[in-house]
């Protein structure tokens, strides 16, 4: 006999009353963006490897490299946030010290997408 399971996203909603699912995911993603991935973390358990891939060493002038970074970023976000069903990540602007991204995510049980415009500036994602 199978035991019923409760989705992780439901626990988030129960713990934080009065906050919309979009706002909750936005907050969680901002925490993720301001954490760093462990280098060589492929051999560690997923719980220990959460964090954003480093972009400072990325050649922001090469579109192929930026596309690769967006794929890495998308994979990190999907590992971190199970309530996201669909995610599109794109670069809006890239320079030596700044990187602006656009995220569009469809959340479970939500009809409207979550849209985020975030940028790295002065050592922090905002």
UniProtKB/Swiss-Prot annotation:
Any one annotated GO CC term: cytoplasm
Annotated localization: Cytoplasm
Disulfide bond residue pairs: none
GO molecular function: anti-sigma factor antagonist activity
Domain of life assignment: Bacteria
InterPro entries tied to this protein: Anti-adapt_IraD (IPR023776), IraD/Gp25-like (IPR007048)
Keywords: Cytoplasm, Stress response
Alphabetical GO biological process terms: cellular response to oxidative stress; DNA damage response
Family: Belongs to the GpW/Gp25 family. IraD subfamily.
The protein's assembly and partners: Interacts with RssB.
Function: Inhibits RpoS proteolysis by regulating RssB activity, thereby increasing the stability of the sigma stress factor RpoS during oxidative stress. Its effect on RpoS stability is due to its interaction with RssB, which probably blocks the interaction of RssB with RpoS, and the consequent delivery of the RssB-RpoS complex to the ClpXP protein degradation pathway.
Name used for this protein in its record: Anti-adapter protein IraD
Organism: Salmonella typhimurium (strain LT2 / SGSC1412 / ATCC 700720)
